[in-house]
Amino acid sequence: MSKKFFIKTFGCQMNFNDSERIRGLLKTIGYEQTDNWEEADLIILNTCTIREKPDQKVLSHLGEYKKIKEKNPKALIAVAGCLAQRTGWELVKKAPVIDIMFSSFNMHQLPELINQAQAGYKAIAILDELPQDEDKIWEYPVERDNKYCAYVTIIKGCDKNCTYCVVPRTRGKERSRALHSILDEVKRLVDDGVREIHLLGQNVTAWGKDFEKPIPFSELLYQVSKIDGVERIRFTTGHPRDLTDDIIEAMADIPQVCNALHLPFQAGSNRILALMDRGYTKEEYLEKIEKLKEKVKDIAMSTDVIVGFPTETEEDFEHTLDVLKKVRFEQVFSFKFSPRPGTPAAEMEGQIPDDVKTERMRRLLELQKSILSEIAKKYEGTVQEVLVEEEKNGELIGRTTTNKWASFKGDPSLLGKIVKIKVIKSSPFSLEGELLEVIK
C-alpha cells in the first residue's frame, strides 16, 4: 500500500505554486495525497513568515499534528517555506516534533530528506541561495487543482530590501528563471489543457534584469503570448519601481494579457514611503496608475496596504486614504504593521499602539467597502468574458479578465471554455450572469 502525505499551505501564490511542485515530486516517489492529516505518513507545512500571525498558526498546527506520532510513530512531520528559511534550527528547538525542514531553494532534495528522517536523523536542510542544480526544481511534474489555469514561477527572491520585509532573507536575491525553461513549461501546460498562464514572482516585473544580457519583462509577455493555446496571461506581483512604460505598452498591445494588475503601494505618505525604502513617491505611483488606466481599457487594480507603520501620523494615514479614493482599487489587501525579527522597521522608534492601528484599519476598510459598492454597480448590465473553471451546486464558475469571480447557469461541457455572460447581479467580489455565447 502506498504511503500518504498531507500538505497545508500558508501565504502567497508563490507558496501555493511551490506546494504544487512538492505534490508532484511526492507522487513520483509513490506517495498519495490525503485531505485527512490523521491518516498521513508525511505531514508538510509550507509556511509564510511575512507577518507574526502565520508564525503562530504554524506553531499551533504543529502542536496538533504531533498527536499523529502516538498513532503512527513512523509518521514524519516536515516544515517548508519561508518560516523554515528564517528560523531553521531555532524552530526545531521550539517544536522538536519536526523531522524534516527545507526551504524553497531545495525542494528537489525532499526524497533524500525523507530517507534521512526515516533512518532516525533530523533532516534539516536550509540553503541561503538557490543551488547550482536549481533547474532540477523545474523538471518535476506539477500537481495542480485547477485544470485550466496554472501558475508559472519566473523569478525567485527580491532585491528591494524594504525595511519591513523578510522576503530578501527568506527568498534570497532576485534570480530569474531562464527564458527557455519558462516557455517549455508553458508549452507543456497548454498541451495539458491549460488556457490561462499566471506568471509569478516576488517581484515579477524585475524578471530578466539579472541576466548577463538582460531581457525586459515585456519581451517575456510577448514570447508567452505567441505560444499557441495561451488564451490568457496574468502576472503577480509587480513592484512600482519596475513597472516600466514598455510593460504598460505590452499590456495594452497583447490581447491575452488580462486587464487586471496587482501593484502594492503600501502607504500614501512620502515620508513613510521613504522610511519603508520603497523607492517611489505617492505622486510617482499615481502617475503610473494614470498611464495604466489610459492605456489598458477598464483595468482593475488591486493592491497591498500597511497600516500603522512606525511613526505614522494621522496626516500620513490620510494620504493612504487619498490613494484609495483616487485609484479606486477593486481589491485591497490591508494589514496592520507587524514587526518582523531582523528587519530595520522592527527596531524603529515610534511604534504605533495596536488600538491606533485597529482604528485606522477600521476606517480604511469602511472607505474601501463604500468604493467597492460603487464599483459593483458599474458591472451590472455589462458583458464580461469568463473562463469557466469549475461547476458547483449546479452553476458554472469562472473569472472575468478583471479577476472577478462570476457564476451562471450552463452545461458542464463548457468547463475550460471562454464564454460571454451578461451580468444581472453584482456584489463587491463576485458577479452573477446569464450565458450569451461561447467564444472559444
UniProtKB/Swiss-Prot annotation:
UniProt catalytic activity: N(6)-dimethylallyladenosine(37) in tRNA + (sulfur carrier)-SH + AH2 + 2 S-adenosyl-L-methionine = 2-methylsulfanyl-N(6)-dimethylallyladenosine(37) in tRNA + (sulfur carrier)-H + 5'-deoxyadenosine + L-methionine + A + S-adenosyl-L-homocysteine + 2 H(+)
Keyword Coiled coil: no
Binding site for [4Fe-4S] cluster 1: 12, 48, 82
Residues covered by the Radical SAM core domain: 144-374
Residues covered by the MTTase N-terminal domain: 3-119
Gene Ontology terms: biological process: tRNA methylthiolation
Cofactor: [4Fe-4S] cluster
UniProt keyword Cytoplasm present: yes
Annotated compartments: Cytoplasm
Quaternary assembly: Monomer.
Function (record text): Catalyzes the methylthiolation of N6-(dimethylallyl)adenosine (i(6)A), leading to the formation of 2-methylthio-N6-(dimethylallyl)adenosine (ms(2)i(6)A) at position 37 in tRNAs that read codons beginning with uridine.
Family designation: Belongs to the methylthiotransferase family. MiaB subfamily.
Protein name: tRNA-2-methylthio-N(6)-dimethylallyladenosine synthase
Species this chain originates from: Aquifex aeolicus (strain VF5)
High-level lineage: Bacteria, Pseudomonadati, Aquificota, Aquificia, Aquificales
